Structures are given as structure tokens and as C-alpha cells.
């Protein structure tokens, strides 16, 4: 089972395309939708939905994937639910760059302070990070500097922030899932 979390643009047709691409790894791909506008509510909702899916799951190696803001959530929810994560161009600093787009961006900073201390150290090697060198929305170099101590970083030379085509990375993702 692969759980997919969309980014800020929840209505993007690219979400459906990524789900179809992920089905080459596992036919059981589940999209969880969330508001993107209310961080604390989103965290509760995502934890509850992922937990529900894991209770009914028969896959011994489930995976959670997310793009952009979905990557922010996939890393945290995956850690809390003890499943491996794959994150594409994760938005690690939504409290800095989502001002005016969501109701309470400061809640992201609050969530960060309430998260498990040194959670990335405890999550070491359980997350695969795929970054675009052509990310027009986020500073991928800053993201790499933040995460490379804990996780493998894979660089993509072609895609932009929304990562429309993940197919060149499917074999790597499949191998990572199999390690689960």
C-alpha cells in the first residue's frame, strides 16, 4: 500500500497522474485529501486517516508519499505512524512561505515545537527525499542542507516543484519500499 498526500494545490490534475505512476510500484495507492488551510486540523485528520488505513492494511511494507506541502506531512505522519516515507520537493518551512495562502501559517511552527525532539535523528534512513534542481517555488538547496544528514537525497534535473513526472524514480522508490 502507498498512501499519497497532495501538495497545496489539492485540485491539480498532476495528483491523479502521480497516483497512476505510483500504481506501477503497488496497485494499492490511496490518496488522502486534507484542507491545506488549517494545519492543526490537518495533522489530526491525517493521523486518523493514515492510522485507519494501516489498521485495514495487509501490506507489511506500506509507504507514504507526498509532494510539496504533502511532503511536509508525509515525513511527520510517516514517522509518527512508523512507516517509510518518500517526499518530493517537501515544503519544510510552510510557516515562512505560506503566509497569505493559509489561515494560520504560524501553526506549522507550533507543530514543529510540539513534535518529537530530534525526530529526524530517530527517523534516520526511513525517508527518501527527491528534490528538483528546477524547483521554482522552494529553495531545494536549503531543503537538502536541512535533510542530507538524515536521509538519502536524490536530485532530479528535469522536474519543477509539482513534480509532474515521477516515473524516472519509480525503481528507486520500489527498492526503498521493499527495504521497509
UniProtKB/Swiss-Prot annotation:
TM annotation in the entry: none
Pfam families for the chain: UPF0227
SUPFAM superfamilies: alpha/beta-Hydrolases (SSF53474)
Family: Belongs to the UPF0227 family.
InterPro entries: AB_hydrolase_fold, UPF0227, UPF0227/Esterase_YqiA
Cysteine disulfide partners in this protein: none
Gene this protein is translated from: ycfP
One GO MF term: hydrolase activity, acting on ester bonds
Protein name: UPF0227 protein YcfP
GO annotations of cellular component type: cytosol
PANTHER family in alphabetical order: ESTERASE YQIA-RELATED, UPF0227 PROTEIN YCFP
Top-level taxonomic group: Bacteria
Amino acid at each position: 500500500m502507498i498512501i499519497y498526500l497532495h501538495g497545496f494545490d489539492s485540485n491539480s490534475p498532476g495528483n491523479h497522474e502521480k497516483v497512476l505512476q505510483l500504481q506501477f510500484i503497488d496497485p494499492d495507492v490511496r490518496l488522502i485529501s486534507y484542507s491545506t488551510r488549517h494545519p492543526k486540523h490537518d495533522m489530526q485528520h491525517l493521523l486518523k486517516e493514515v492510522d485507519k488505513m494501516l489498521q485495514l492494511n495487509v501490506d507489511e511494507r506500506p509507504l507514504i508519499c507526498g509532494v510539496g506541502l504533502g511532503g511536509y506531512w508525509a515525513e511527520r505522519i510517516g514517522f509518527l505512524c512508523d512507516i517509510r516515507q518518500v517526499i518530493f520537493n517537501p515544503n519544510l518551512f510552510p510557516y515562512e512561505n505560506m503566509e497569505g495562502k493559509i489561515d494560520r501559517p504560524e501553526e506549522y511552527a507550533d507543530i514543529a515545537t510540539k513534535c518529537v525532539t530530534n525526530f529526524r535523528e530517530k527517523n534516520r534512513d526511513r525517508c527518501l527525499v527527491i528534490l528538483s534542481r528546477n524547483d521554482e517555488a522552494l529553495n531545494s538547496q536549503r531543503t537538502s542542507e536541512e535533510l542530507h544528514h538524515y536521509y538519502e537525497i536524490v536530485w532530479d534535473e528535469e522536474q519543477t516543484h509539482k513534480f509532474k513526472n515521477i516515473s524516472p524514480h519509480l525503481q528507486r522508490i520500489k527498492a526503498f519500499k521493499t527495504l521497509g
